[in-house]
Amino acid sequence: MSSTATVTESTHFFPNEPQGPSIKTETIPGPKGKAAAEEMSKYHDISAVKFPVDYEKSIGNYLVDLDGNVLLDVYSQIATIPIGYNNPTLLKAAKSDEVATILMNRPALGNYPPKEWARVAYEGAIKYAPKGQKYVYFQMSGSDANEIAYKLAMLHHFNNKPRPTGDYTAEENESCLNNAAPGSPEVAVLSFRHSFHGRLFGSLSTTRSKPVHKLGMPAFPWPQADFPALKYPLEEHVEENAKEEQRCIDQVEQILTNHHCPVVACIIEPIQSEGGDNHASPDFFHKLQATLKKHDVKFIVDEVQTGVGSTGTLWAHEQWNLPYPPDMVTFSKKFQAAGIFYHDLALRPHAYQHFNTWMGDPFRAVQSRYILQEIQDKDLLNNVKSVGDFLYAGLEELARKHPGKINNLRGKGKGTFIAWDCESPAARDKFCADMRINGVNIGGCGVAAIRLRPMLVFQKHHAQILLKKIDELI
């Protein structure tokens, strides 16, 4: 992505945002927040609510709650806010006739797309697609995008079976209505231990991160391979980590060779996020792609959380420099729109094999256009790289200053997509709670990890505030 502006340290993307956190209550939520949550509980499940937010007052990198507490947000709504709260560009776009028309006349895109849909799809998705990707299916969420990616791989496998007349057989047509073969064949999708790909029936079967996501739910008996468990610092464990990655590739080979039914797709995150911010080297992904190609298995890269700039490139997998583009790349979160990029028209099934009423949300496609243009205009990828380097160096210093508190620091050279392990799950949870009451909204992942997910407008002065708070509270 080319840039049209150069950001200096004196440039503030949000000149009117607070100078820093400000806490007015002894707890978060405070009295007003607790009262609002109680009112919500009459109609809405609040069991996972952290605190209600005043989104009218929130700005830039700062959340404001109902009691007037101001928090530096380095979790950004589970990595979904790309360019700040109440971004002026987005607010202006929201008041445009284009957005008003599309919001108030939401189309069933599969049947009745608006006249400008080709332009919207190009400007809001394809223009910023990963290298080599040419087409897009819009969906409603990251889970949905992954689910449909599996479906496209399965339908490609099924539709390309040789048949005497070229059309589906009577037995296939009849048996599928009874959830039976040959019309409903047994096929599988390979995923990796500690992965997270969503909570729908197919995507949940490939999610392997936490029991709470899966307990009580039926699941497809699909295979999983180990994701590399790298040792840190990376430069001190080169040989061990290479052996670990090869072990995982050998496991993939074994599964694809011996699984009892065809494995039609393999899905993987560039960095396992919910599962603990687990990394692997570009060499691992090169070997994985080669292994999948050998067995004619579709390669799906889940960029739902890693996509749209947090790693310093628009798409994390582009840092691997693969010889071929992945078969599919799924996206959501910071993109705001959700969907699947692909480059082979053969993945398009017959009409109505993949279909739903909405087939995406045209408003979100328009919103993504403004977001991605803002990323380019404000040179936010370079901002993420430079701030990420500064932040990582600061965390290295704190790790030396506080031995045993910041373990397995990872994400060097990956923008602000940084994480570390606390001593225990309890220590991690306490740290997150302490940071919140001291003005920083931060999140965890995996067993005992802290993951940083600031916005792309997170700057050096924000990083200095964050490092100071970590130093005080770790």
Curated annotation (Swiss-Prot):
GO cellular-component term (any): mitochondrion
Cofactor: pyridoxal 5'-phosphate
Coiled coil: none
Binding site for substrate: R199
Feature: compositional bias, Polar residues: 1-13
MF-aspect GO terms: 4-aminobutyrate:2-oxoglutarate transaminase activity; pyridoxal phosphate binding
Enzymatic reactions: 4-aminobutanoate + 2-oxoglutarate = succinate semialdehyde + L-glutamate
Pfam families: Aminotran_3
Main location: cytoplasm
Location of N6-(pyridoxal phosphate)lysine modifications: K333
Compartment annotation: Cytoplasm
UniProt entry tagged with the keyword Cytoplasm: yes
GO biological process: gamma-aminobutyric acid catabolic process; glutamate catabolic process
Alphabetic keyword roster: Aminotransferase, Cytoplasm, Pyridoxal phosphate, Transferase
EC numbers for this chain: 2.6.1.19
First-level EC class: transferase
Positions of pyridoxal 5'-phosphate binding: G142, S143, T357
Matches recorded under NCBIfam families: GABAtrns_euk (TIGR00699)
Subunit structure: Homodimer.
Stated family: Belongs to the class-III pyridoxal-phosphate-dependent aminotransferase family.
Function as written in the Swiss-Prot or TrEMBL entry: Required for the degradation of gamma-aminobutyric acid (GABA), which is important for utilization of GABA as nitrogen source. Deaminates GABA to succinate-semialdehyde, which in turn is converted to succinate by the succinate semialdehyde dehydrogenase. Cannot transaminate beta-alanine (BAL).
Name under which the protein is recorded: 4-aminobutyrate aminotransferase
Organism: Schizosaccharomyces pombe (strain 972 / ATCC 24843) (Fission yeast)
